[in-house]
């Protein structure tokens, strides 16, 4: 899906949500910390969900 090509967006908020995003350069789902607001679709709660949607 095209959401897998979107850049990682931490957002301006300062909450601490461990999430995963698909890194289009490496072709892998990678952990990052999401701040809690103004993110995009390339933001998954689990590694499994990221891999399932982005086929990593």
Curated annotation (Swiss-Prot):
Record keywords, A-Z: Disulfide bond, Nematocyst, Protease inhibitor, Secreted, Serine protease inhibitor
Posttranslational mods: Contains three disulfide bonds.
SMART domains per UniProt: KU
One GO cellular component term noted in the UniProt record for this chain: extracellular space
Pfam family, one: Kunitz_BPTI
GO molecular function terms listed in the Swiss-Prot or TrEMBL record: serine-type endopeptidase inhibitor activity
InterPro entries attached to this UniProt entry: Kunitz_BPTI, Kunitz_BPTI_sf, Prtase_inh_Kunz-CS, TFPI/VKTCI-like
Record's keyword annotation contains Disulfide bond: yes
Disulphide connectivity of cysteines: 4-54, 13-37, 29-50
UniProt site (Reactive bond for trypsin): 14-15
Stretches assigned to the BPTI/Kunitz inhibitor domain: 4-54
Location(s), subcellular: Secreted; Nematocyst
CDD domains: Kunitz_SHPI
UniProt main location, coarse: secreted
Function noted in UniProt: Serine protease inhibitor that inhibits trypsin (Ki=73.8 nM) and chymotrypsin (Ki=993 nM).
Family recorded in the similarity comment: Belongs to the venom Kunitz-type family. Sea anemone type 2 potassium channel toxin subfamily.
Other comment: Does not inhibit potassium channels (Kv1.1/KCNA1, Kv1.2/KCNA2, Kv1.3/KCNA3, Kv1.4/KCNA4, Kv1.5/KCNA5, Kv1.6/KCNA6, Shaker, Kv2.1/KCNB1, Kv3.1/KCNC1, Kv4.2/KCND2, Kv4.3/KCND3, hERG/KCNH2) and TRPV1, the capsaicin receptors. Does not inhibit the serine proteases plasmin, thrombin, kallikrein, the cysteine proteinase papain, and the aspartic protease pepsin.
Record protein name field: PI-stichotoxin-Hmg3c
Taxonomic source organism: Heteractis magnifica (Magnificent sea anemone)
């Amino acid at each position: 899906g095209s959401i897998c090509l979107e850049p990682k967006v931490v957002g301006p908020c300062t909450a601490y949500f461990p999430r995963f995003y698909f890194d289009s350069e490496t072709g892998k789902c990678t952990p990052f910390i999401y701040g809690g607001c103004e993110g995009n679709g390339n933001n998954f709660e689990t590694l499994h969900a990221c891999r399932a949607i982005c086929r990593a």
